């Protein structure tokens, strides 16, 4: 039983899990790209540029989910002083920052043909940029503070403050007049996105989730 918790056995399991996820990732990636680039139709208004959505939207979802996880785990770590939680948040933060940047960049590329500009001080775009700064500050704190307790306290405060930004990003399209359209996918209501576009969107989301899992396990 004790061997199960031994570091060498844990790393052995992680290696096996990485190989397993890796094989699924490449198969699902091929399927997702086929649906996104071949089977999915162009939008009747946006044309082929709508295909950027299949990376942009999942990246935005993951960036929001990652920061939410960091905030919750940081609070738990601050209260209960669980070292593993600190390691988890430090591993998630660069992943979340990467996907936030992907969401912002792909959104800018998509915005040019759709809105006629790469950047606008739209409520959602601005709040996403603010979240990227929160990610960056969180990473820098753990990078340059030698004292774990001090780093945990400051990073927990940053994470909690940053958590306030999450509902602003989510509901900005409903609270203010923005360039972004209201949500097309709703958990509790009726989604307005057609299944021919929803399918590749969800497939790409699962592909990126697997990619996140691979990076996390490797770190």
PLM segments and residue spans:
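Polytopic transmembrane helical bundles with strong interfacial aromatic enrichment
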Residues: 2-219
């Amino acid at each position: 039983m004790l061997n199960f918790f031994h570091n060498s056995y844990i790393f052995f399991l992680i290696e096996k899990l990485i190989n397993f996820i890796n094989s699924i990732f490449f198969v699902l990636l091929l399927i997702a790209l086929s649906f996104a680039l071949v089977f999915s139709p162009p939008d009747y208004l946006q044309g082929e540029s709508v295909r950027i959505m299949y990376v942009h939207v999942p990246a935005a979802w993951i960036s929001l989910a990652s920061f939410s996880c960091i905030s919750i785990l940081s609070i738990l770590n601050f209260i209960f002083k669980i070292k593993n939680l600190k390691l988890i948040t430090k591993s998630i933060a660069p992943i979340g920052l990467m996907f936030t940047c992907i969401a912002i960049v792909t959104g800018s590329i998509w915005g040019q043909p759709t809105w006629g500009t790469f950047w606008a001080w739209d409520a959602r775009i601005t709040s996403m940029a603010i979240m990227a700064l929160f990610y960056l500050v969180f990473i820098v704190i753990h990078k340059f503070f030698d004292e774990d307790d001090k780093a945990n306290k400051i990073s927990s405060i940053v994470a909690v403050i940053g958590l306030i930004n999450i509902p602003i990003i989510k509901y900005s399209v409903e609270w203010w007049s923005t360039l972004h359209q209201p949500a097309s996918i709703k958990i509790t209501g009726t989604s307005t996105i057609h299944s021919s576009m929803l399918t590749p969107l969800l497939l790409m989301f699962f592909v990126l989730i697997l990619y996140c899992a691979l990076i996390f396990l490797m770190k």
